[in-house]
Amino acid sequence: MRRRGGRIAALASAAILVVAGCSAPNRDGGSAGGNAEIGKSSDINPQDPASLKKGGNLRLAIGALPSNFNTLNIDGNEADNGSMQRPTMPRSFTIAPDGSMKVNTDYFTSVELTKTDPQVVTYTINPKATWSDGAPITWEDIASQINATSGKDKAFAIASPNGSDRVASVTRGVDDKQAVVTFAQHYPEWRGMFAGNTMLLPKSMTANPDVFNKGQLDKPGPSAGPFVVSSVDRTAQRVTLSRNPNWWGTPPLLDSITFLALDDAARIPALQNNTIDATGIASLDELKIAQGTEGISIRRAPGPSWYHL
């Protein structure tokens, strides 16, 4: 996805994102870049994927490499870690441009509330869905993760139960590709149990406390996405994702995604130096720098926010 033209800066309601062309070697203007004016409340410049070129390396910044790649673990529960692994892991729902939730059919053919008293949710897994180690994704992965994050065994250092503490049982459905989750207490946010940064992990990574807590300290475990983590370089503070050769869904346009650990103060200079392709803006000073840099465009869109109380 090499984009002729400059870098793009996007402004959200509470934050600004500055984006450069996807590793583009040139910075000679173009429809996707070079405009440093702040647009309307939403001007993200959406494009039909069919109109985009294939290939390229998207370079993004993160705060630091995670001390634990397990996003369900208390030490791995970081926004950057979740964002970095989203292209590599199963999630049950996606958010459409209009804000609605849709079943992620790459992984599930259906996710339905099949009973209300007691509450029962049935997950039917895509027959093609497979972990990167060759194991099929089955109901046992869902059962193992719910057991690990339920809080019943305190040896699992979980970040949050995320509804697992309300589950009475997880049973096999019509076959190994279906999980029937029965709740002991109603859980209105059941759609979020395997969505967002709470991705589904393989049972090999949630089967016991030792592997849950220590099995992903150096690198992620088996994954199942259009991309796989192909390199973790702690010396260079860089993580590289490459295409999953066994991906069963729509092939990604990008060849790779690179995440580079940078301090906040280093991100705008890195964008100016064409080291990264996108970053957020957190202050008026950074906005002014972005506006004054040739080849940078600023994009703005509403962004949801929430607080722990």
Regions found by a protein language model. Name each.
Residues K288-R300:
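Ligand-binding "clamshell"
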Residues C22-G33:
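Bacterial lipoprotein signal-peptidase II cleavage site
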Residues N244-I289:
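Ligand-site clamp/hinge motif
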Residues K53, T124, A159-A207:
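Surface-exposed binding/hinge segments that line
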